[in-house]
């Protein structure tokens, strides 16, 4: 049985020790991922240097995406009450910034290597993925990523990711790939747009990437679309028209559900002379901001459900997606092998039949040669061995050729990690000792089928355990005393503590 290497075992043990203190329910989820990985190793879906547990983030993760000058960095600074990110009307940062809590009073900026080499953070081993997009980009990891720490209580227990200003027309393929990566990892995605641009139709390519790819996702509820700097519409008093224009732009990309949150920075807001109008804008801003902050506070809870959901999804994917796909690939390979084998047999039979139509003199020589061959058992046996070895050589050459052809088709039909996974698993089914007539993939035994059923059942039980923590349908649970208001989630006032002051 294939086992994970020592590094993976050590990482999972460390993760379990951390979760015992932070969220004991998720310790069982680590065990489920460990068992699921064993199935992946057996089928070739996973390399022994990998684990399904390391392919998802275990920290609550919030990503902030948006167009240039949409106020992403300003929002983060306000949320942290610290001017961590540089702000401006133009693109001021072209890197993905992972922001986490740090005990030092002064904020620190660490290079991309800090993320690429540490499995506790997102973007672990991202340099390898960048090399797949464009050779040599992995060495330039510091040009794409950076890690910042900040002594802000809002960062305790969660990680923020600030993305560079987005423009699909000019964005490099590596940056687009990183954007898709953080979208997949995140528990909450805040997508910022700039209300100062009244013609969202001109940004159709950007909307297509930021919005179009989300409408069919099972986790589409984790996306919040935020129309920032809505105060600029106060002069014409037309916020509804601006919001409507952006909603129509989203609808053109296929997103008909959902809503826009409209906010602005009170410190940099356009002066609104009309008292009633200012109060209306402030009320709407406070309402939407409160909802956004509430969703951020819920991320820790959503994280637990997301991890357990990922466990069940991976287990179902193996049985419902990878097994049928591998069966199809094996059948495709078998078909090509048998066609070529039949061709060699027909070619040999045709040659034997053609020998009967040779001129009489040549036919007599062939008959004499065969008579001498069958007259000596030793020579006959040696000839048979040579023929069998030749047939086996041709058969295994055909197997390798057919396997290489199927691998090439996999790379054409699938992209990136999916192609790599299918290729690795398919190759395990084409080794020399495996018959071409085996319909099921390597590792798809009754034991592993049973293991997947147990994993799915355990995941459902973990969801019930989480529900027991957060719900009480019968109403019999003792009422918990109300938390003091000073401990409740804060509202962003717009005031940012200067860099020089202690946070």
What are these regions (language model features)?
Residues 2-142, 152-153, 158:
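Conserved G1/Walker A P-loop phosphate-binding module
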Residues 12, 16, 66-72, 92, ...:
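Cytosolic/nucleoplasmic, non-transmembrane interface domains of endomembrane
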Residues 121-159, 167-254:
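Conserved C-terminal guanine-recognition region of P-loop GTPase G domains, centered on the G4
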Residues 167, 178, 420-503:
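Charged, low-complexity cytosol-facing tails and large interhelical loops of integral membrane proteins
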Residues 219-224, 229-303:
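Canonical P-loop GTPase G-domain recognition
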Residues 302-348:
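Cytosolic-side membrane-insertion boundary helix
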Residues 334-420:
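Transmembrane alpha-helical hairpins and terminal membrane-anchor modules
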């Amino acid at each position: 049985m294939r086992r994970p290497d020592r590094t993976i075992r050590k990482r999972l043990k460390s993760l379990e020790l951390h979760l015992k203190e932070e969220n004991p329910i998720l310790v069982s989820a680590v065990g489920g991922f460990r068992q699921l990985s064993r199935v992946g190793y057996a089928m070739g879906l996973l390399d022994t240097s990998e684990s399904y547990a390391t392919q998802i983030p275990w920290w609550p993760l919030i990503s902030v995406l948006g167009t240039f000058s949409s106020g992403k960095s300003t929002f983060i600074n306000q949320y942290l009450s610290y001017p961590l990110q540089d702000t401006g009307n133009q693109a001021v940062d072209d890197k993905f910034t992972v922001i986490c809590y740090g005990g030092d009073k002064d904020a620190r900026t660490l290079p991309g290597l800090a993320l690429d080499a540490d499995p506790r953070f997102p973007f672990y081993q991202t340099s390898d993925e960048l090399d797949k997009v464009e050779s040599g980009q992995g060495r330039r990891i510091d040009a794409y990523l950076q890690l910042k720490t900040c002594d802000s209580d809002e960062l305790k227990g969660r990680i923020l990711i600030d993305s560079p200003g987005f423009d699909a027309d000019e964005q490099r393929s590596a940056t687009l790939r990183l954007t898709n990566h953080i979208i997949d990892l995140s528990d909450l995605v805040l997508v910022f747009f700039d209300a100062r641009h009244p013609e969202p139709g001109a940004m159709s390519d950007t909307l297509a990437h930021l919005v179009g790819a989300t409408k069919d996702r099972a986790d589409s509820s984790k996306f919040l679309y935020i129309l920032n700097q809505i105060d600029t519409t106060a002069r014409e008093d037309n916020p509804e028209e601006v919001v409507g224009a952006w909603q129509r732009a989203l609808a053109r990309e296929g997103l008909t559900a959902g809503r826009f949150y409209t906010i602005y920075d009170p410190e940099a807001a356009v002066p609104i002379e009309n008292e009633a109008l200012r109060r209306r804008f402030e009320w709407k801003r406070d309402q939407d901001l409160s909802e956004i902050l509430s969703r951020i506070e819920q991320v820790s809870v959503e994280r637990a459900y997301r991890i357990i959901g990922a466990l069940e999804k991976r287990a179902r994917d193996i049985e419902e997606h990878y097994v049928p796909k591998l069966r199809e690939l094996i059948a495709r390979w078998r078909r090509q092998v048998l066609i070529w084998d039949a061709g060699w047999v027909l070619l040999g039979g045709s040659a034997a039949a053609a020998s009967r139509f040779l001129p009489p003199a040549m036919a007599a020589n062939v008959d004499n040669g065969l008579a001498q061959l069958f007259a000596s058992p030793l020579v006959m046996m040696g000839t048979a061995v040579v023929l069998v070895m030749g047939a086996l050589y041709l058969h295994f050459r055909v197997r390798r050729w057919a396997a290489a052809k199927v691998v090439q088709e996999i790379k054409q039909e699938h992209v990136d990690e999916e192609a790599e996974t299918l290729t690795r698993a398919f190759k395990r089914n084409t080794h020399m000792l495996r018959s071409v007539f085996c319909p099921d993939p390597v590792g798809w035994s009754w034991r592993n089928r049973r293991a997947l059923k147990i994993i799915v059942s355990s995941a459902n039980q973990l969801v019930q355990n989480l529900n027991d923590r957060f719900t009480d349908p019968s109403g019999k649970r003792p009422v918990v005393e109300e938390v003091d208001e000073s401990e409740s989630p804060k509202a962003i006032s717009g005031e940012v503590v200067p860099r020089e002051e202690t946070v």
